[in-house]
């Protein structure tokens, strides 16, 4: 008689998502959701490929060949970029590292999948907002309405802190330090906390917003809320920024050539700090980067800074270059042979 007992794959997936990722790895809900989406796509692909319901799939159905076929499917049929393909593969790798630890007898199986390499991708040019562009965008916002005041405070805080979108929407009243030294307490990736200094102007904006919403400082209430007084989501922030950019494009044509999104505000903060002479190590701590190499990319972005650096250095004058060497020889071949 058939039983409905879960197979090994089902049990491993349950332990991976219910215990390993949130408790042992301490991953954020967004990362867990990304991993879940990746494995759901994989299981659906396998179910379609093997013409079987996903509930009947077991660990033996998920080999290196199947994973490679899945990665090809992502790029060729779903038109995913190499970066998205690598994100999906990262989730699969994480799951099979867990499989290897839980079942050493499956180590060879796991190693074959862990041996599938990430694809080398072309890094895109990072689009960011210049300081003048940000000032213009903020000036267009109608601050005579509660929604306008919220949007202004939201974008100003994002530019001041360079915080990730999730860090902004997670910001609670207790995370605000609106007495000197002014700063925000942010919860970053990997649940790493950091303090970020804020300008007096940002302090005033946050104070007014809390007063208007009747939020008690020190409480657990989220600072940025929608019209239903529920916390803004990442998608809500994206919508607000998109709306503000569309309004600003009429006055700032240069915005039409840029691919901008909420993370662009973070890039804009980094470039503004770099232009102000702040060193990369400080910028790395400001943004909450765990690796300085992540911050180093900003040093290669701003072409104006490169031009100014070149202009500030006088080229070395080569006195010998004033005469062409081979003119003293009978032929150019003789000169080349003498090298």
Question: Predicted segment positions?
Answer:
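Conserved catalytic core of the tyrosine transesterase superfamily
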Residues: 1-339
């Amino acid at each position: 008689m058939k039983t409905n007992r879960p197979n090994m794959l089902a049990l491993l997936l349950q332990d991976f998502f219910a215990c390993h990722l949130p408790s042992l790895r301490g991953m954020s809900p967004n990362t867990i959701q990304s991993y879940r989406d990746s494995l759901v796509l994989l299981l659906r692909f396998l179910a379609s490929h093997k013409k079987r319901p996903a509930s009947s799939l077991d660990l033996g159905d998920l080999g290196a060949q199947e994973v490679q076929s899945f990665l090809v499917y992502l790029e060729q049929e779903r038109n995913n970029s190499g970066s998205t393909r690598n994100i999906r593969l990262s989730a699969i790798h994480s799951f099979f590292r867990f499989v290897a630890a839980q079942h050493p007898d499956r180590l060879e199986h796991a190693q074959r999948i862990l041996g599938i390499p990430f694809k080398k991708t072309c890094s895109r040019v990072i689009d960011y907002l210049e300081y003048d562009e940000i000032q213009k965008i903020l000036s267009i916002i109608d601050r005579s309405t509660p929604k306008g005041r919220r949007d202004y405070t939201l974008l100003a805080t994002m530019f001041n802190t360079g915080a990730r979108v999730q860090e902004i929407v997670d910001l609670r009243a207790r995370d605000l330090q609106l007495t000197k030294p002014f700063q925000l307490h942010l919860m970053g990736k990997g649940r790493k906390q950091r303090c970020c200094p804020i300008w007096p102007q940002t302090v005033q904006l946050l104070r007014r917003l809390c007063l208007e919403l009747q939020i008690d400082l020190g409480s657990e209430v989220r600072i940025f809320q929608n019209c239903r007084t529920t916390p803004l989501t990442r998608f809500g922030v994206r919508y607000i920024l998109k709306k503000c950019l569309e309004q600003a494009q009429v006055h700032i044509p240069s915005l039409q050539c840029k691919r901008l999104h909420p993370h662009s505000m973070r890039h804009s903060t980094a470039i503004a700090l770099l232009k102000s002479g702040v060193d990369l190590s400080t910028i790395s701590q400001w943004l909450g980067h765990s690796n300085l190499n992540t911050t180093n990319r900003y040093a290669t972005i701003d072409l104006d800074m490169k031009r100014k650096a070149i202009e500030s250095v006088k080229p070395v004058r080569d006195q010998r270059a004033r005469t062409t060497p081979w003119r003293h020889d009978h032929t150019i071949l003789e000169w080349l042979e003498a090298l």
